[in-house]
A protein has these predicted regions:
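Secretory-pathway/membrane protein signature
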Residues: 1-233
Length: 233
């Protein structure tokens, strides 16, 4: 059937890119090589085919994970230490609050809203778009836009290790830990500002213990993806 013919055509081209080019991170020569193959194929059916360059920061989007783990782990440790070093409670808790605010800012902006807030802190690369246009045979009434991506992604370990049964609880517990540590540091700072020493506050002690218990979860989340293993597909 015609549907099977087109499906086989798509499968053959995908297989060709995977075998001929292989793994291709965004902004690499391998990605461009794949795009050139696609451009040549598109020239057989389209009127205009162009390859346009643009700049990007390929490591920025997933960078919020490492940054968040560092900031929140440090904040949890500082909260814990404030109980044993009450004289340094203000700087410890103040820095801890600042770190969790920084972490939450990048989680919300980079991960939830796809804002490029981490781009200035990561390496810049040049990627490309393949733009193909097929002109109408008559009057233009509608435009159909089909888009995709030519690069291949880093391996998401959690997907292989356990699929949704591991991905969802790991991210969920990790985010609960981030929010709990943020609230704990802020509450502890308010208690200290109110005149209570961290050494005398059972609330600060309990909050610090719970926050520290989340640290193994934070470090486990660092294994979410493997930057050294890139997919072919």
């Amino acid at each position: 059937s015609e549907r099977r013919m087109y499906a086989n055509y798509v499968a053959r081209n995908i297989k060709n890119v995977c075998k001929t080019v292989g793994p291709r991170c965004a902004g690499t020569e391998k990605e461009l090589e794949a795009q050139k193959l696609m451009a040549e194929e598109l020239k057989t059916t389209c009127d205009d085919v162009n390859i346009e360059s643009f700049s990007l920061h390929p490591r920025a989007f997933m960078g919020w994970i490492q940054l968040t783990v560092f900031c929140v782990t440090a904040a949890a440790v500082m909260l814990f230490l404030s109980h044993f070093f009450p004289a340094a409670a203000y700087p410890l808790l103040g820095i801890g609050v600042a770190l969790v605010v920084i972490a939450l800012f990048f989680v919300i902006s980079e991960f939830l809203f796809y804002k490029e807030t981490l781009d200035p802190f990561t390496k810049k690369s040049t990627s490309h778009n393949v733009v193909a246009v097929r002109k109408p045979s008559g009057e233009t009434k509608r435009r159909i836009i089909v888009s995709g991506h030519a690069d291949s992604a880093m391996e998401w370990r959690f997907t292989y290790w356990g699929g949704p049964k591991l991905v969802v609880p790991s991210i969920g517990i990790g985010m609960i830990g981030v929010l709990f540590t943020a609230v704990a540091d802020i509450v502890a700072l308010i208690i200290v500002i109110g005149g209570t020493s961290p050494a005398d506050s059972k609330a600060i002690w309990v909050l610090s213990i719970i926050s520290v218990c989340f640290i193994p979860v934070f470090f486990f989340c660092l294994l979410f993806f493997d930057p050294k293993r890139i997919f072919e597909g």
